[in-house]
């Protein structure tokens, strides 16, 4: 790792040395503390449910990176990576430590991010709340023993004080809430929000800064491996089917959200899963449902007086969650790492109905679509009219990328070349017309296409190039209707298809302009210029 040492300030050392700083508590001990402190409620599934108050999701406007000379020029500053001066940070840091020093109890966890020891970040997590500490134990990688935990000298520390509130006029924040990362001081400082996902995504952002510095790819994707050791990566924004398609009973899960790719292969950054729980059912998503048991943290789920859970109720938020250790899932790789990928799948739910259900990408096209990170969401209007709305998230994870996007795209391109990876763009959205006119592509057909891709059956298939997007479409895929494969054939009026396709192409081009002249060549070779 680029950063491998960290010296605690004397203030942190004194806090951690106090008897009231409870180190590496077991799940049962943390359950007892959570219930004793009225931080959560026990459910009939055995999981703890905690409410996060007014923040039921991430707070991107309150996320900062400290501007320090050693790395100031590396960061892609803007609305996502907002700067805060080091002096402001240190003053706030000091106030938070003084606040925590007065607490009756704190909860401390030592663990890791990264299941490959060659690319591992050692962590200390200091929590004001016991349920946050159990969340950290679930999401990060636990040491095998307490003795191992005590030996950890952290590269990075999370200090979480959700009940401490900043004063924006003094502290330089935008509100009472703050998530501040200092690469110099190796700290993520969190206050004013009880949403536990800030810890998970805070470390992911740190990883996305550190790993590329060592020419290691960090990725917002899921990954699985087949019986023959063939590895597949799945990239996709919310609603594209990433969780559903990567949860394959014939393949073992490496991880569901965050991965690294180094000289050894693919490795999970996390030790757990943070699954969406809204409308969860055992029938639809048995793997996730069955993982919700003793040791799991539920967030903002509706629970009645008898402890019965209603996953369909969005009373508190649509963003209900379940955080559980990955060993709650049966069909996993242990440890969570595997060889270099054979196949990469980019998932998009195209509500315009013009992208092919599956197409094979060249390296340049893969880099272009990786930078674009396209899907389409459905925006309701006051009059009840719904129109597709394009959504572009750079590298399928723009909120968590501290470096310039081209750094990640270049790394991906080099790895595709080096390991001969097949890359496919899979549309899980509409065909035969846009949303409201066309129809959703059958999940069974999508599964069949993905299965053919990741087992290598499409590698040497016959392809035809579509004349709008320049994408290579397979002439046939076993058990998938041929008329479905080329989208123009699914539309009743070819000219209407071309008009809609050109509209989407224009949106891609407009979005790509934000990357500037550095990617002009890529726009020509991989895009629609």
Swiss-Prot record:
Binding positions (ATP): 201, 220, 236-244, 285, 321, 440-441, 446
Annotated metabolic or biological route of this protein: Carbohydrate biosynthesis; gluconeogenesis
Cofactor binding annotation: Binds 1 Mn(2+) ion per subunit.
GO terms, molecular function: ATP binding; metal ion binding; phosphoenolpyruvate carboxykinase (ATP) activity
Cofactor(s) required for function per UniProt: Mn(2+)
Chain positions recorded as substrate binding sites: 58, 195, 201, 321
Reaction(s) this enzyme catalyzes, per UniProt: oxaloacetate + ATP = phosphoenolpyruvate + ADP + CO2
UniProt keyword Cytoplasm present: yes
Location in the cell: Cytoplasm
PROSITE patterns linked: PEPCK_ATP
A GO BP entry: gluconeogenesis
InterPro entries the UniProt entry points to: PEP_carboxykinase_ATP, PEP_carboxykinase_C, PEP_carboxykinase_N, PEPCK_ATP_CS
Top-level EC class: lyase
This enzyme's EC code(s): 4.1.1.49
Record-annotated membrane-spanning stretches: none
GO cellular component: cytosol
Membership in a protein family: Belongs to the phosphoenolpyruvate carboxykinase (ATP) family.
Record's function text: Involved in the gluconeogenesis. Catalyzes the conversion of oxaloacetate (OAA) to phosphoenolpyruvate (PEP) through direct phosphoryl transfer between the nucleoside triphosphate and OAA.
HAMAP family: PEPCK_ATP (MF_00453)
Record's protein name: Phosphoenolpyruvate carboxykinase (ATP)
Organism: Staphylococcus saprophyticus subsp. saprophyticus (strain ATCC 15305 / DSM 20229 / NCIMB 8711 / NCTC 7292 / S-41)
Gene that encodes the chain: pckA
């Amino acid at each position: 790792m680029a950063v491998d040492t960290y010296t605690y300030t004397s203030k942190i050392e004194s806090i951690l040395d106090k008897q009231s700083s409870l180190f590496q508590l077991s799940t049962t001990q943390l359950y007892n503390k959570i219930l004793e402190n009225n931080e959560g409620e026990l459910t009939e599934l055995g999981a703890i449910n905690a409410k996060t108050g007014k923040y039921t999701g991430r707070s991107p406007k309150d996320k900062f990176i400290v501007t320090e000379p050693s790395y100031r020029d590396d960061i892609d500053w803007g609305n996502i990576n907002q700067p805060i001066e080091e002096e402001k940070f240190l003053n706030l840091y000091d106030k938070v430590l003084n606040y925590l020093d007065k607490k009756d109890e704190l909860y401390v966890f030592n663990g890791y991010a990264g299941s490959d020891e060659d690319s591992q970040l050692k962590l200390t997590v200091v929590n004001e709340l016991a349920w946050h500490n159990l969340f950290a134990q679930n999401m990060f990688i636990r040491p095998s023993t307490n003795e191992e935990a005590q030996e950890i000298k952290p590269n990075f520390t999370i200090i979480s004080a959700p009940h401490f509130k900043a004063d924006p006029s003094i502290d330089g924040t935008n509100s009472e809430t703050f998530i501040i990362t200092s690469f110099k001081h190796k700290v993520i400082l969190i206050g004013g929000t009880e949403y536990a996902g800030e810890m998970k995504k805070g470390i992911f952002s740190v990883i996305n800064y550190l790993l590329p510095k060592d020419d290691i790819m960090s990725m917002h994707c899921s990954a699985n491996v087949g019986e023959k050791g063939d590895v597949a990566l799945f990239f996709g924004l919310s609603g594209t089917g990433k969780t559903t398609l990567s949860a394959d009973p014939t393949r073992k899960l490496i991880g569901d959200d965050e991965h690294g790719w180094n000289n050894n292969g693919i490795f999970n950054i996390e030790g757990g899963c943070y699954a969406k729980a809204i409308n969860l059912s055992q029938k639809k998503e048995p793997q996730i449902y069955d993982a919700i048991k003793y040791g799991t943290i539920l967030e903002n789920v509706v629970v009645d007086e008898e402890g019965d859970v209603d996953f369909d109720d969005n009373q508190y938020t649509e963003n209900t969650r379940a955080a559980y250790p990955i060993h709650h899932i049966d069909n996993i790789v242990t440890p969570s790492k595997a060889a270099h990928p054979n196949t990469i799948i980019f998932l998009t739910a195209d509500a315009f109905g013009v992208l092919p259900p599956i197409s094979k990408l060249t390296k340049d096209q893969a880099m272009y679509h990786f930078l674009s990170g396209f899907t389409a969401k459905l925006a309701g209007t006051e009059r009840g009219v719904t129109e597709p709305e394009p959504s572009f998230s750079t590298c399928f994870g723009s909120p968590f990328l501290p470096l310039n996007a081209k750094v990640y795209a270049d790394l991906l391109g080099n790895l595709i070349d080096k390991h001969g990876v097949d890359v496919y763009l899979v549309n899980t959205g509409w065909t035969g017309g846009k949303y409201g006119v066309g129809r959703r592509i059958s999940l069974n057909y999508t599964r069949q296409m993905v299965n053919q891709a990741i087992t290598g059956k499409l590698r040497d298939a016959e392809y035809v190039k579509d004349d709008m997007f320049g994408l290579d479409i397979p002439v046939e895929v076993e058990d998938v209707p041929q008329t479905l494969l080329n989208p123009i054939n699914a539309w009743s009026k070819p000219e209407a298809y071309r008009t809609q396709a050109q509209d989407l192409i224009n949106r891609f081009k407009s979005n790509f302009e934000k990357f500037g002249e550095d990617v002009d060549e890529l726009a020509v070779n991989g895009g629609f210029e």
